[in-house]
């Protein structure tokens, strides 16, 4: 009997994983089942794609969990893999009054069938030397982040001298933002490290779901949509993603 107060952990990040060789599908299934024996947070279900064949839709606790599982599948089981762009789960409010949760862009109903899409938001904490505050703020703002607070973790000098100014620039500062989870899935961490010369660290926690102006972006190859390349994105970013 389970102890009271505990609940299974819910996956927050989802991606499709397909073998590069179609005949490796059974081996991929067996490998995922073996990993799941020691990793109850890993969830997966069969998925088929017209472009990529048979694979699995996998759910992870976060980005590190996703990267670790993919790396183990390749290293420990010798599998060649194709992974689709990571996504989050969205809450879709239907015109019937019901709501559904989707973790695959291909499952989003037609525009006329729903009133609203809600996406998960996280509270993100970034710790960095103070000299990189400007670069961090610019990055988070470009990702639809909402500023919450900033706090110096070390006392700063108040007298005006070259030595003390340098010390102030190296003092650690903590910045706190609310930001959509989808905005930190792909390149956020790399850009954060690049903009701070590797000095910044980050942590985040889920806070709630919020309504957003989201649309489904289909990618066409030879004038035909490729389901594996579809994504849900903010309307204002759809054009730039489509051209990328």
Stretches with model-predicted labels:
Residues 1-244:
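Structural and coupling elements of P-loop NTPases
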């Amino acid at each position: 009997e389970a102890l009271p107060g505990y609940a299974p952990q819910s996956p927050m990040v989802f991606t499709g994983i397909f073998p590069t060789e179609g005949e490796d599908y059974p081996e991929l299934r067996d490998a995922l089942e073996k990993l799941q024996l020691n990793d109850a947070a890993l969830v997966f279900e069969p998925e088929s794609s017209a472009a990529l064949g048979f694979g699995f839709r996998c759910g992870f606790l976060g980005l590190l969990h996703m990267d670790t599982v993919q790396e183990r599948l390749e290293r420990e089981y010798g599998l060649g893999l194709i992974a689709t762009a990571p996504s989050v789960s969205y809450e879709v409010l239907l015109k019937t009054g019901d709501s559904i949760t989707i973790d695959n862009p291909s499952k989003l109903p037609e525009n006329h069938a729903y009133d609203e899409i809600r996406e998960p938001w996280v509270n993100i904490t970034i710790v960095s030397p103070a000299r990189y505050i400007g670069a961090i703020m610019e990055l988070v703002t470009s990702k639809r982040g909402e500023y919450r607070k900033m706090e110096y973790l070390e006392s700063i000098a108040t007298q005006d001298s070259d030595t003390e100014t340098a010390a102030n620039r190296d003092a650690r500062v903590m910045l706190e933002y609310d930001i959509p989870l989808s905005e930190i899935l792909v390149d956020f961490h790399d850009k954060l490290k690049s903009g701070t010369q590797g000095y910044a660290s980050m942590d985040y926690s889920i806070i709630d779901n919020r309504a957003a102006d989201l649309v489904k972006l289909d990618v066409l190859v030879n004038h035909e949509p490729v389901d594996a390349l579809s994504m849900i994105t903010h309307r204002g970013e759809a054009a730039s993603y489509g051209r990328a």
